[in-house]
Amino acid sequence: MRWQCGTRFRGLRPVVAPWTALLALGLPGWVLAVSATAAAVVPEQHASTAGQHPLDWLLTDRGPFHRAQEYADFMERYRQGFTTRYRIYREFARWKVNNLALERKDFFSLPLPLAPESIRNIRLLGRRPNLQQVTENLIKKYGTHFLLSATLGGEESLTIFVDKRKLGRKTETTGGASIIGGSGNSTAVSLETLHQLAASYFIDRESTLRRLHHIQIATGAIKVTETRTGPLGCSNYDNLDSVSSVLVQSPENKVQLLGLQVLLPEYLRERFVAAALSYITCSSEGELVCKENDCWCKCSPTFPDCNCPDADIQAMEDSLLQIQDSWATHNRQFEESEEFQALLKRLPDDRFLNSTAISQFWAMDTSLQHRYQQLGAGLKVLFKKTHRIVRRLFNLCKRCHRQPRFRLPKERSLSYWWNRIQSLLYCGESTFPGTFLEQSHSCTCPYDQSSCQGPIPCALGEGPACAHCAPDNSTRCGSCNPGYVLAQGLCRPEVAESLENFLGLETDLQDLELKYLLQKQDSRIEVHSIFISNDMRLGSWFDPSWRKRMLLTLKSNKYKPGLVHVMLALSLQICLTKNSTLEPVMAIYVNPFGGSHSESWFMPVNEGSFPDWERTNVDAAAQCQNWTITLGNRWKTFFETVHVYLRSRIKSLDDSSNETIYYEPLEMTDPSKNLGYMKINTLQVFGYSLPFDPDAIRDLILQLDYPYTQGSQDSALLQLIELRDRVNQLSPPGKVRLDLFSCLLRHRLKLANNEVGRIQSSLRAFNSKLPNPVEYETGKLCS
């Protein structure tokens, strides 16, 4: 609703017309110069208001819209439940005030009606005054600008905030008076009622406001606000006589100024501008100099520090100190927040928490994450404000003799907060908690605190770390990980107990001693075994044209169940008839612990670094030789049965190359053309027997399924792993070790295949948990 009242303000022109004076607005450094006929002074409060920088709102966080009072009022009412706003207003007409003195000069070419004192001061300056003279005689007396024109006006409005949820409810009225033209004790207020009251506001203001306030008190459904802006009112002209009311600073008014140099003679204008700039910028303490896009004050001898505004610098340094305090307050409030304290209470105290463990609890707490984001947002605002002040501070200190003194705040990283939690947990036994050092598991206490360290639980982890802390004292280790044993409060690598009760694998024979005994074929290292062959007999001559099979077996399961046997050498005494051209060839197969012939491995004679047969003559007349292959400590191996396959080849001399060549003999159908006969006198195995207790090993295996304690199961697994590795070390040469341990379980302990597989799986799983586990691939030998 607009109501123009321009016709009622036609009397304004006569009031403004007498202002034929030289006016200057009272901004900082400016004064008001008028003639003696109409002198007035701008109040000080207006001068300070106008001194605000016009672009200061750009440095705020949200801009002018969010700073507007109307927006703030609306947001406040909206939070209170008022969701609808009705506003009725009228805008006063605009009046433009012009400087008539300047109009007379421009349009009528009349001289300016300057005060006699002003004219005298201009003449006293002469034609070449210095800047100090201009400042003292003109600027300090009359200012730097004067009023050219101004636009004045105002607005009056009524705003009603409405909560529609409460509006339709019936209200009890006291005294039987109705709210709007009715009678009765109960009345419902509608939007139509509010519309009627708002329409009558500019007709009968007092009565309308009284009724609206009654509705506001009775229902709580509305909120009434009056607003008046601008210096003028349609019903009041009294305040037009004061300059303060005309020049009031409000968003509805516009004031246009002009430099005072336009009123001066030509020869004074340039000096006046220079003096005005120096006066405003340098505060009369120096002369403004601009060069290469930079301006500064050339200080006078009286004011050597005119370029260094100490008050402004000190104010900015104080602002930085306040920001630093606010920064610390933000961090302290975060530490004291419910989310942070709730995390501290949820952390377990039965084990030590390193930074990684705390980070996992931190990451799972969504409420703490949200609170930490709020902290980051607040610190980000402070950080931007700090940088803005620092840039301005360095600009001010650019030509100062001292550097600015400040300290930039530093954002605390996540690792800091994780360490802070450790400090509160383990270093909080004093008034002020200390700082926890994770590497040394100790606390650094404040200088005035003798001790701040509390009990630090044991550290859990893999390898030598604890598996559990002691229930009665969390600072001590209660149990260890697999492969470690608790000793004097520390977890040390567990070593398997001696295997002598299960299998004696130690021997005192050194390499030189063993070689001497084998050369002598000492009976003390002979393993007595049973000779079996269907093709021949010991000490009898036979025709070697066909392959002969013979074996030496021990039948340990039947005769020697408490022993296993190790072979160090194999020796045969072979005799040939005189002038025989046959050469014996042996293929050796070794069965380690029994079973079928297919579970034997072939001995790679003279392959790689494996030894070859050694032949020594025994009886020249009978042409007998001892054929011996020595394994020694390097190639010794378990054996239960040795299979020897004997065949022959023909030895001949190549005349062309003077070399011995061999070829297979042809089948002789005529006995008269026989190439010779062969005889085996002895077949011996040299080695030693080891004590072996299959029942003890079975009991050890039973502990895998029925352990007395967890420690007994781990000890049994360690012993079985040690036994497996020691047995497999005697595997024959090859790219892959043969799994002799499975053969031992299968044939000497009579375990089923599935039992053997289960045991091997348990050993592999346990071995993978041990420190520095050694895994190796094995080849299958026994089915």
From Swiss-Prot:
Signal sequence extent: 1-33
Listed SMART domains: MACPF (SM00457)
Chief location: secreted
Residues carrying a glycan: N185, N354, N473, N579, N626, N658
Keyword Nuclease: no
Stretches assigned to the MACPF domain: 85-281
Superkingdom of origin: Eukaryota
Subcellular location: Secreted
InterPro entries per record: BRINP (IPR033237), MACPF (IPR020864)
Disulfide bonds: none
Keywords on record: Cell cycle, Glycoprotein, Growth arrest, Secreted, Signal
UniProt entry tagged with the keyword Glycoprotein: yes
GO cellular component, one term: neuronal cell body
Any Pfam family the entry gives: BRINP
Purpose of the protein: Inhibits neuronal cell proliferation by negative regulation of the cell cycle transition.
Xref: PANTHER family: BMP_RETINOIC ACID-INDUCIBLE NEURAL-SPECIFIC PROTEIN 2, MACPF DOMAIN-CONTAINING PROTEIN
Similarity comment: family membership: Belongs to the BRINP family.
Protein name: BMP/retinoic acid-inducible neural-specific protein 2
Organism of origin: Pongo abelii (Sumatran orangutan)
